[in-house]
Amino acid sequence: MYKKIFLSLVLLILSITGVSAQINTDRVMNIGRNALYFEDYILSIQYFNQVIKVKPYLADPYFYRAVAKLSLEDYKGAEEDCDKCIERNPFIIGAYQVRGIARQNLGN
């Protein structure tokens, strides 16, 4: 009897909270930006990769990942991410700046 009540409560709670396998991309983006702020560039790239995997059409994760790659001196990767960011949203001015810095360091 108690087992049935317990299972019913668990199912009710799960249905109310909306448990799903999808990630909350806004939250993951915030965590990635915080990692970037605290100069944990590798961790921030991992978080931005998660967002890109789920929503590849967004421009922001490409931009922030480019900033992290630039900080790690991965200039080619930063340039490629800026290109993808600009392709998705040409109004992110910082992407042009980061791409320019990356190209300057590449000698282009």
Feature locations, PLM:
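Alpha-helical tetratricopeptide repeat
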Residues: 2-8, 12, 18-108
